[in-house]
């Protein structure tokens, strides 16, 4: 086995996935940036959730907004719903794993807030339930998916934004999700700070 060639192939595949995605995803990413920025300017907040690697992505996103991305600026209201082990285990034990995010959305979300819902497959039950809860609270949903968008792609409303990576391999989708998250953070900063 030629490990160097294998590593190089992974780099090439990852780069190609991102290049394949740009034409399809640039406009909805720009729309998501504008929607998120308007939410934050008007005193709203962004709740983010996902499972596994997508949980890490939701935490990464919230950290970039609360702290900073690449430029100093005021703190921005973002909460990752994946971090409180007591809440997650209490809801998972007393209700079900499918409700670990939806109950938090109902408790923390308000009209005008945004749910950033991350699911590589678009079929995660607890993300689907979180989206339903967000819709109940008149929140916008920005869904970050792959593999055609799954059930999540089918349940989004006209005011929601679907950022679907045109790929089927989980690793490539996750790598592109991170790039999308960085694009969101960069765009929010550009609008808030007036950067060209």
Curated annotation (Swiss-Prot):
GO molecular function, one term: zinc ion binding
Gene: gmhA
Annotated source species: Dechloromonas aromatica (strain RCB)
Reactions that this protein is recorded to catalyse: 2 D-sedoheptulose 7-phosphate = D-glycero-alpha-D-manno-heptose 7-phosphate + D-glycero-beta-D-manno-heptose 7-phosphate
UniProt name for this protein: Phosphoheptose isomerase
Cystine pairs: none
Sequence positions that bind Zn(2+): 60, 64, 174, 182
UniProt xrefs under PANTHER family: DNAA INITIATOR-ASSOCIATING PROTEIN DIAA (PTHR30390:SF6), SEDOHEPTULOSE 7-PHOSPHATE ISOMERASE / DNAA INITIATOR-ASSOCIATING FACTOR FOR REPLICATION INITIATION (PTHR30390)
Enzyme Commission numbers on file: 5.3.1.28
Role, per record: Catalyzes the isomerization of sedoheptulose 7-phosphate in D-glycero-D-manno-heptose 7-phosphate.
């Amino acid at each position: 086995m030629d490990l160097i060639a294998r590593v190089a192939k992974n780099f090439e595949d990852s780069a190609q996935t991102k290049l394949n995605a740009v034409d399809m995803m640039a406009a909805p990413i720009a729309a998501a940036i504008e929607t998120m920025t308007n939410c934050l300017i008007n005193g709203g907040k962004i709740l983010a959730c996902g499972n596994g690697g997508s949980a890490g992505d939701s935490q990464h996103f919230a950290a970039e907004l609360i702290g900073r991305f690449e430029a100093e600026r005021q703190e921005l209201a973002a909460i990752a719903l994946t971090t409180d082990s007591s809440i997650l285990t209490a809801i998972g034990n007393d209700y079900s794993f499918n409700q670990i995010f939806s109950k938090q959305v109902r408790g923390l979300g308000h009209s005008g807030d945004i749910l950033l819902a991350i699911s590589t497959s678009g079929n995660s039950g607890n993300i689907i339930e979180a989206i339903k809860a967000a819709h109940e609270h008149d929140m916008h949903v920005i869904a970050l998916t792959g593999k055609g968008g799954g059930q999540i792609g089918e349940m989004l409303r006209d005011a929601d934004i679907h950022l679907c990576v045109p790929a089927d391999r989980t690793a490539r989708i996750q790598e592109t999700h991170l790039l999308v998250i960085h694009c969101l953070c960069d765009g929010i900063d550009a609008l808030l700070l007036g950067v060209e």
